[in-house]
Design a protein with these regions (language model features):
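Glycan-recognition and catalytic cores of secretory/periplasmic carbohydrate-active enzymes
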Residues: 1-216
Length: 216
């Protein structure tokens, strides 16, 4: 069996990733330790895991990791993607989508594409990159979260994930990986925004450790 335990403790929340032997696909979700309850499948965390399995295969050459990467990427491509709204919702069936999540998912798909050469993953990564550019671009910022299927920006909240900021550059890297002129221009826009705002991002958070945690 394959077991990937990636624990990220944030207050009472723990991310618990695992797969059982013989499962037809790999999906991952948040686990709330205090409540002893799994949340629905997280497309973002599944995207991170696709990248992790592809990396493990590149380092070890073990086919089990490649197989896990393929099954994870196939779930993202075939199930998590919402063809009606042409984007990746926060969770399958969710009524919102996050800029940050889309970039992480697309980069995971690109990692598996590089490992396999399967054009399905490249095509879906491009779809996600297009959604980032068309659905989230605002006036001087990229909206952190939009409604699905209407794709209207949702009001900002006093949480890092509900505000635009330099952390979005991590997801915008997918535009560099696309390798075309238009995508590169979008990355340059995101880079300029990050450079212009990084000094004030989370400026109201007194703990440097907490700031770094939020930037992950």
């Amino acid at each position: 069996s394959i077991l990937l335990a990636l624990l990220c403790i944030k207050g009472c929340r723990v991310i618990k990733l695992c797969s059982q032997k013989g499962s037809s696909l790999l999906t991952f979700n948040y686990y709330r330790a205090a409540a002893h309850a799994n949340l629905p499948v997280s497309s973002e965390i599944t995207g991170y895991t696709a990248s992790a399995f592809a990396y493990l295969h590149s380092r070890t050459g073990e086919h089990a990791y490649l197989d896990a990467a393929i099954r994870t990427a196939s779930f993202l491509t075939d199930t998590a993607w919402d063809s009606a709204s042409h984007t990746f919702p926060f969770e399958p069936g969710s009524d919102r989508a996050y800029f940050f999540d889309l970039g992480i998912i697309a980069r995971g798909l690109m990692a598996v594409y590089r490992a396999t050469g399967d054009e399905r993953y490249l095509s879906r990564a491009r779809d996600a990159a297009l959604s980032l550019g068309f659905d989230f671009l605002g006036d001087g910022c990229f909206y952190p979260v939009i409604s699905v299927p209407m794709k209207e920006p949702l009001p900002e909240e006093p949480r890092w994930s509900r505000k635009p900021g330099c952390y979005q550059l991590k997801s915008a890297l997918i535009w560099r990986q696309m390798g075309d002129e238009h995508a590169d221009r979008m990355f340059q826009v995101a880079l300029a925004m990050a450079l212009a705002t990084h000094e004030t991002f989370l400026s109201d958070e007194p703990s440097m450790e907490t700031r770094m945690d939020r930037l992950h």
